[in-house]
Every structure is written in C-alpha cells, then in structure tokens.
C-alpha cells in the first residue's frame, strides 16, 4: 500500500510539472527547496553510412523522457546538502539514469559531490542536434578497428561505478578535482591493436581529473588532465597494460550578446598510439555550426602511421513553437570522413557518413 501511494504521489507531481511551463517548485523557501521538472526529446533520423554493411540508407526514431527530482536544504551559516535524480524513460522501452548524486558544501564556495554525474565539459560542441563520427567518441567504447575522436571524457563521469568530486570557487577562479573508481574495462571492446582484451582479469581503476578554469568577463578558459593511477587495471591477453592512458585538454569560450563560441583541444597519450582532437563551434542566435578534427598516430606491429577524421555539423532551433513556451523543433545534420594513412589498410575503413535529424523538444 505504501509503495502504491509513493508511485501515485510521484505521478501526481510529474503531471503537475508537465501542466506548468517550467517545472513545479514543491518547496522553495529560506530553509531549502524541492522541485520536479524534466524534458522530452524525440528524434526522427536519416543516415547514409558507408559503414552500413548492406549500404542502405537508414530511417529511425529514438528519444526519451527525463524526469528530474532535485532538492536542497540550507543552514543559516550558508552550508547546504543537496540531492538530484534524473531517471530516463527511453522510447525503446528501456529505463536508464542520467544523474543521481548527493552533494554538500557551502553556497558560492566549495562542494563535495558523490554518485553519478558529469564533471566539467572540456570539449563542448555547442548546439549538436546530430553529431556522429567515423570512429568512436571517448565516452563510448574504444574499438580497435576504428578511429578515436578523443574528447577528454574518459574520466568525466556517469560511469557504472563510484564517482567523487570536490570543487571550489575563488572569485573568477574555479578548481575541480574529479575521480572515478571501479571497473573501467567497458571502455574497451574485444580487442586492442588486434590483440584480445583480457576482461576476465580486469582490476578496479582509479581515475583522477583535475580542472582549472578562469573567467574574464566574456571569456572563460579551462585546462585539465585525466589519468588512471592503477597499474595493470586492464591488460590484453599478452599481459600488456593498456589502461596506461593520460589525457590533456584545453578549452576556451567567448560569450557575448547573441554569440557563443567554443575552441577545444584534447590530446591522449595511450599505449602504442596518440590521439589529438581539435574542435571549433559557434552559436549565433538559434543557428549553430561546428567542426571537429581528429588525428590518431599508431606505432605498433599492428599498425604504423596516421588516421584522420574530419567532421562538420550544423543545427538550427525554432523556439516557442505554436507560441508554447519551451517547446522547440530543432534541425541538425552532420558529415564525417576518415582517411587511413597507416600501413594496415584493412584496419580502418575509409567510410563517409551523413546524417540529418528533426528533433522535438519540450522542457517542463
């Protein structure tokens, strides 16, 4: 009976939030707050990918509904505790989770956060309604036979195991130290440079990711490094430590009037390969345009030479459609190519991919 009541109450709160334009504040006073909100995102996709085995164009629809429960409690000394949970209800029928964390600290000063969340974005891509690559992005699996567009995300967060972060602001200076602990063997697929990954003997990793950011009016710059401190956390079947990976990142943002511009650089020093990525994107009013370049250099018996990935993308947002506040229709497209200059011609497919998307988005 108690469970039924809780579910009914949650359904009532969600219904109330959707009836409002921008969520509902259940409690909001000097002692704390509790709110329910979320958003709906549905995509209608077209893709023409040379990597598709039968060569046919693809049409599909995907999306999800995110419900956010967030609350904070304050003290007279300026300290607080907070909690946030964001369950995802996917159009496939699966139920997933975005953020789920607990934090405490002092307002406008320091905070400690534990759970599941994302740390500072060191490779922002702007308005990316539809953005994919001929290869992998670094918050997905590292696939041995694909190019790797590294983006300083291997220790950013939202992993399946533990995560802890400390951050503090000193005026215009922001400091952050993020960590991820636990099994990170899911970063790799079955092989690394043609050799099978020994998933059965993986150890728990300990990844650290410090960030320093400084704001100068319209400009913000940030630098970061991420690395795994545990030796032999992930090895191949020959015993080679493939978890020995250190990444470096630098990003800058200019935000003035209707303009928002990001410039990004990321570099990964991994076992028998290096990965460098450069990104530039701009948002003017509701129009976004971006470009990402990735260069992989291999030096092993499996492959020697370079693989390069070029990706361009564009987006546009129609806001407040039908005069409904926070209801948007977004258009997005991307085009990506890969060029294999290694001595292993069969290792990397030179595929060109194109995609277009219409997105329906409503924030409640």
What residue ranges belong to the model's regions?
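Outer membrane beta-barrel
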Residues: 24-45, 56-184, 213-217
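Residues that define the transmembrane beta-barrel architecture of outer-membrane proteins
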Residues: 32, 55-65, 95-100, 158-162, ...
